[in-house]
Amino acid sequence: MTTTLQRRESANLWERFCNWVTSTDNRLYVGWFGVIMIPTLLAATICFVIAFIAAPPVDIDGIREPVSGSLLYGNNIITGAVVPSSNAIGLHFYPIWEAASLDEWLYNGGPYQLIIFHFLLGASCYMGRQWELSYRLGMRPWICVAYSAPLASAFAVFLIYPIGQGSFSDGMPLGISGTFNFMIVFQAEHNILMHPFHQLGVAGVFGGALFCAMHGSLVTSSLIRETTETESANYGYKFGQEEETYNIVAAHGYFGRLIFQYASFNNSRSLHFFLAAWPVVGVWFTALGISTMAFNLNGFNFNHSVIDAKGNVINTWADIINRANLGMEVMHERNAHNFPLDLASAESAPVAMIAPSING
């Protein structure tokens, strides 16, 4: 009899836990994805904070030249970072128990792997949690689809790119200056600015910002007048009121006259789909671009594409960009290479540009 009661109590406890996890009445929805998301993001956050403050220098290039990244080792908020794991580790999984000691684990940049793996799993579960809450509330699933764009970007720079390059030391550092270094080296090695997928991403982000500003300002300006002509239209409203405050027909008329008729949406759902889809598709393409360049399918190369009748090169902006790329490449990881492959495998490049002689 006692055993039976214990089983019922256990089953009842599990059922209550399930109901609590899936309840939409909680202040913050947990969900089954949240059961994984909460501990993984907590682990990533705690490790990041500790490493950013106190981690010792990391031998990122695997040549016994540690790079300092934490605040206690001389950095500030701008220069500080969690330094990626060592090139000596490569793509090997490097948890704490694989190192001979905690000092070795820290020296080889073990915290970086701990942070990015927990972060990527937690961020993925956050997307799943968005779908789960939408499902519980009877909503359509497009919120998590939009979130997949920044998630794909995170996977591209923290996982796909290191896999393609053969080492987690090539992943993006977790800090401000480290991110800038990652961007500069990426341009030097892959010419990302000349990659069409990155260009689509730029159009998506800047265009999305423009459309967001246009939409917000237009809606804010298209008030339904609740006051007399002698009073300010602002007096007819209070912040946070439930009633609709703007007239989409008036907004459509204004914008149609400002640009032209068919540049303006007269359907609210079509408008908001466009506002969501434009930046999302752009960022998707950027993530795809990073993922292809991870395997060295790089941006366009128009070097030496214009020559005169005698075969002499007439430099274009593509050649100027190439010269900048070479300069950035020879400066990074200075002691890790005897000579950059791009320079060692070709004829010597002049230090300064030479203006072509004009025989008139």
Swiss-Prot record:
Residues 345-360 form a propeptide. The keyword Oxidoreductase applies. A quinone binds at residues 215, 264-265. It is a multi-pass membrane protein. The chain crosses the membrane at residues 32-53, 111-132, 143-163, 192-217, 273-295. GO terms for molecular function: chlorophyll binding; electron transporter, transferring electrons within the cyclic electron transport pathway of photosynthesis activity; iron ion binding; oxidoreductase activity, acting on diphenols and related substances as donors, oxygen as acceptor; oxygen evolving activity. Pfam families: Photo_RC. CDD domains: Photosystem-II_D1 (cd09289). PROSITE patterns: REACTION_CENTER (PS00244). One of its GO terms (biological process) is photosynthetic electron transport in photosystem II. It is found in: Cellular thylakoid membrane. The D1/D2 heterodimer binds P680, chlorophylls that are the primary electron donor of PSII, and subsequent electron acceptors. It shares a non-heme iron and each subunit binds pheophytin, quinone, additional chlorophylls, carotenoids and lipids. D1 provides most of the ligands for the Mn4-Ca-O5 cluster of the oxygen-evolving complex (OEC). There is also a Cl(-1) ion associated with D1 and D2, which is required for oxygen evolution. PSII binds additional chlorophylls, carotenoids and specific lipids. InterPro entries: D1/D2, Photo_II_D1/D2_sf, Photo_RC_L/M, Photo_RC_L/M_CS, PSII_D1. NCBIfam families: psbA (TIGR01151). Belongs to the reaction center PufL/M/PsbA/D family. PSII is composed of 1 copy each of membrane proteins PsbA, PsbB, PsbC, PsbD, PsbE, PsbF, PsbH, PsbI, PsbJ, PsbK, PsbL, PsbM, PsbT, PsbX, PsbY, PsbZ, Psb30/Ycf12, peripheral proteins PsbO, CyanoQ (PsbQ), PsbU, PsbV and a large number of cofactors. It forms dimeric complexes. Precursor protein interacts with Ycf48. Part of a photosystem II (PSII) assembly intermediate complex PSII-I; crystallized from a strain deleted of psbJ, it forms monomeric PSII before addition of the oxygen evolving complex. PSII-I includes 3 assembly factors not found in mature PSII (Psb27, Psb28 and Psb34). Photosystem II (PSII) is a light-driven water:plastoquinone oxidoreductase that uses light energy to abstract electrons from H(2)O, generating O(2) and a proton gradient subsequently used for ATP formation. It consists of a core antenna complex that captures photons, and an electron transfer chain that converts photonic excitation into a charge separation. The D1/D2 (PsbA/PsbD) reaction center heterodimer binds P680, the primary electron donor of PSII as well as several subsequent electron acceptors. This is Photosystem II protein D1 1. It comes from Thermosynechococcus vestitus (strain NIES-2133 / IAM M-273 / BP-1). The lineage of its organism: Bacteria, Bacillati, Cyanobacteriota, Cyanophyceae, Acaryochloridales. The gene is psbA1.
